[in-house]
């Protein structure tokens, strides 16, 4: 019985492997290892507040790109390690955080007195994110509540005005753009519990709609994904993402996979099917 895999041992193994790959927490802006020749650097900044589990998001995102052994993912579990230096040589950033300051990480003690709060979209990071996309060609996947960054410059850059979700409910994603390589051939799918954020496109002439969403209970129909060119770089907005389980929907995993390649201006490789991913 010593070698039998249980839910507990599987969780321990998975969490240990994920923790080993994370940016160190011991400094105000701890620097990752230098980018190796030929390596693809992806910086992931997801969850990180009282309602979203960033470690669970991180594990799902890592699993989508697990077959790409030369793609190195740096997942920031605390805003205090995020700096312009961290993304200065990144090929892609993936964000799923709103603009309010919040502080949480997977290590150490949680102190109710004197805790510091940091915002991802501060006056240093926001211009750096824009410049790296526009001037250097870094890709940006702006996921879910990234639209609530609270900054006019970032809202203009990703090309949308945010609309708040209503009831958390099943949401159908549909009308996938058959002309775009990120969504060509993708069939409609449903996420059983989702915040159906919406957006208003600021400049339709420069924006491509990738797909739409339909709320099952209140029937609100809205844009669910879009993309646009920004200087040397590209931005893709993907609104599904309230709970980590949406990243187990095979169709959305494929959209995410394709979006990463497209945002980095790379030829999109065939998506490796995931098979049975049920940890339980």
Show where each model-derived region lies:
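N-terminal secretory signal peptides and thylakoid transit peptides that target proteins
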Residues: 1-18
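C-terminal segment of classical bacterial N-terminal signal peptides
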Residues: 23-27
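Aromatic-Pro/Gly-enriched surface loop or interdomain linker
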Residues: 31-92, 274-280
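Extracellular ligand-binding/catalytic regions of CAZymes and related secreted enzymes
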Residues: 37-40, 67, 77, 217, ...
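Short alpha-beta junction capping motif
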Residues: 45-46, 87-150, 232
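Solvent-exposed loop/turn segments at secondary-structure junctions
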Residues: 49-51, 80-81, 99-102, 146-150, ...
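An acidic, glycine-rich "communication" segment
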Residues: 58, 142-219, 272-280
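Short, surface-exposed beta-strand/loop micro-motifs that present aromatic residues
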Residues: 198, 220-229
């Amino acid at each position: 019985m010593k070698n039998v895999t249980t839910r507990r041992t599987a969780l321990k193994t998975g969490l240990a492997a994920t923790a080993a790959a994370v940016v160190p927490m011991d400094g105000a802006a701890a620097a990752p290892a230098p980018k190796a020749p030929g390596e693809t650097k992806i910086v992931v900044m997801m969850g990180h507040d009282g309602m979203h589990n960033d470690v669970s998001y991180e594990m799902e995102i890592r699993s989508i790109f697990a077959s790409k052994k030369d793609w190195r993912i740096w997942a920031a579990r605390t805003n205090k390690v995020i700096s312009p230096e961290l993304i200065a040589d990144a090929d892609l950033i993936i964000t799923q955080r709103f603009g309010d300051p919040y502080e949480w990480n997977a290590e150490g003690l949680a102190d109710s007195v004197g805790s510091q709060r940091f915002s991802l979209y501060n006056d240093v990071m926001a211009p750096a994110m824009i410049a790296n996309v526009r001037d250097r060609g870094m890709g940006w996947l702006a996921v879910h509540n990234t639209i609530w960054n609270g900054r006019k410059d970032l809202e203009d850059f990703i090309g949308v005005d945010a609309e708040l979700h209503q009831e958390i409910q099943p949401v159908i994603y549909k009308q996938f753009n058959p002309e775009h390589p990120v969504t060509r051939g993708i069939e409609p799918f449903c996420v059983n519990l989702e915040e159906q954020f919406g957006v208003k496109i600021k400049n339709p002439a420069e924006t491509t709609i990738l797909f739409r969403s339909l709320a099952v209970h209140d029937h609100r129909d809205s844009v669910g994904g879009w993309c646009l060119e920004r200087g040397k770089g590209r931005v893709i907005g993907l609104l599904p993402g309230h709970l980590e389980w949406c990243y187990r929907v095979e169709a959305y995993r494929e959209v995410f996979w394709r979006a990463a390649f497209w945002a980095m201006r790379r030829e999109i490789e065939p998506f490796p099917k995931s098979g049975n991913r049920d940890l339980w």
